[in-house]
Swiss-Prot record:
SMART domains: KAZAL. It comes from the Eukaryota. InterPro entries: EGF-like_dom, Kazal_dom, Kazal_dom_sf. Disulfide bonds join C92-C122, C96-C115, C104-C136, C183-C214, C187-C207, C196-C228, C268-C281, C276-C292, C294-C303. Glycans are attached at N56, N140. This is Tomoregulin-1. The gene is Tmeff1. It comes from Rattus norvegicus (Rat). The record marks T98, N99, G189, Y190 as: Reactive bond. Neuron-specific restriction factor that prevents herpes simplex virus 1 (HHV-1) infection in the brain by blocking viral entry. Also able to restrict herpes simplex virus 2 (HHV-2) infection, although to a lesser extent. Acts by preventing the association between the viral glycoprotein D (gD) and its cell surface receptor NECTIN1, thereby inhibiting fusion of the virus and the cell membrane. Also able to prevent the association between the viral glycoprotein B (gB) and MYH9/NMMHC-IIA and MYH10/NMMHC-IIB receptors. One of its GO terms (molecular function) is receptor ligand inhibitor activity. Residues 345-373 are cytoplasmic.
Amino acid sequence: MGAQAPLRLPAAPPLAVCGYTSVLLLFAFCLPGSGASNQPAGGGGDCPGGRGKSINCSELNLRESDIRACDESSCKYGGVCKEDGDGLKCACQFQCHTNYIPVCGSNGDTYQNECFLRRAACKHQKDITVVARGPCYSDNGSGSGEGEEEGSGAGAHRKHSKCGPCKYKAECDEDAENVGCVCNIDCSGYSFNPVCASDGSSYNNPCFVREASCIRQEQIDIRHLGHCTDTDDTSLLGKKDDGLQYRPDVKDAGDQREDVYIGSHMPCPENLNGYCIHGKCEFIYSTQKASCRCESGYTGQHCEKTDFSILYVVPSRQKLTHVLIAAIIGAVQIAIIVAIVMCITRKCPKNNRGRRQKQNLGHFTSETSSRMV
């Protein structure tokens, strides 16, 4: 047998060659970075959105990151974009006065005045509007500004079950032997922020007010910041009438608010300056009226009358000490004045007698002297 001829594959048709070539070119073009590697240094590649040409669009990306950090869509409600180091920051520049003209925000929180509300809206970038003038009287909040789940307002979390109506975040423990309302309020994570409540007691923070309201199943509101003092009139610390309360539409109150004003008795606004002549003016929003806390020794609607009954009141130990010291100093001063007056009155007659004797001696004439001789 002769030599075997080598096998030869049939020649591919021209159309198949073109198809293979097109697939290879398309695959090479779609490889990541293949387009960027063929670009010359200094440009040629279109950046996303047709905003310029660069190798990797780094400059544009940097600018876009700054814009995304602070622009009109992310810095609203009175905020201003300002440079902060290498980037931009949304700054809320509100110079709020400290007058107590409380307003109720749409998030259920009470703010010291409308400026504080706008500043909170800017800081949290949330739409907060004024829904009522004066503090919020919510069904499940006491105006403490700690969130919609907190507070001791009337009718908060009423649950009707075997326990009866459980209010103020109390829950019915039906599995217990003694079925009743229990309070599972944990105040361990709250910082020390003493407040004076409407029951005349001081609490370490607003959370303990809610806990006491839950345990006692009665409404206890926060009157003012700080411990209760002797000047707090317990007659003014009564409970608010449920009929006077207002429940605004709550949008979002999950954040802590440091701009929230606490209490239902506030100092009067500037337009009521001089309302109390001898006392402190307080505005009670539950009645929408101003009242006066008169100083010691004064009475009347505007503290304009002198209270003479104060003369018969036994002062405290500290005040009694001051009274005794003042009495001793006054007695010493009176004694000194009396002594000076007595000395003057005693010396004057002697001087007068001496002057008269001298005058009489001067009246001797020459005739009287010759007679004596």
